[in-house]
Amino acid sequence: MSPTSVAIALPIETKLLTPLYDWGRRFDWSHVKEAHIIHIVKKNVTPLEFGLVEMPDESTFKEMVPTLEKFLRDEAQKILPPSFRGECYFHLSRDFSPEEEMITLLKKTNVSVVVVSTRGKHGLDGIFHSSFTDKMVRFSPCDVYVVRPE
């Protein structure tokens, strides 16, 4: 059965975007009614002399939103073919755990498949690197399609 709704976990690294462009050109979009383009900004907490600082904070994130929204739209045009006639939704948020936020979003949108791009870590790098892709494969409520850089 072909998926009728697809989520694309959009990274910002060029190395990880290229495989998504290739996948988008090869994928049969004729049966897809919804495409969800998702990017989650990772929040970090940094200890400083005067206390803990959360980055990006709420005001910084609000300043980033217009640029990130444009980025999502621009990248969607590179991934989705001009012949795509379904609805396209953009999701942008921030969280300490982008993986958990993504899983929550996947449950809310009830997509058939999520497409993620992996760094392709192998050997010791793979053992010590807990990746977004690994968590999607383990905990996603839908099918996961993994694309890899060449």
Protein language model annotation of sequence segments:
Residues 26-29, 107-108, 138:
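Solvent-exposed polar/charged
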Residues 139-150:
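Short, flexible loop segments at boundaries between secondary-structure elements
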Residues 52-56, 107, 132-133:
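Short, hinge-like loop/turn segments at secondary-structure boundaries
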Residues 78-114:
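Structural beta-alpha unit
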Residues 56-71:
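A short acidic, glycine-rich active-site loop
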Residues 2-58:
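Small/aliphatic-rich secondary-structure junction motif
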Residues 3, 113-139:
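Glycine-rich, Arg-bearing micro-motifs that act as flexible, cationic patches
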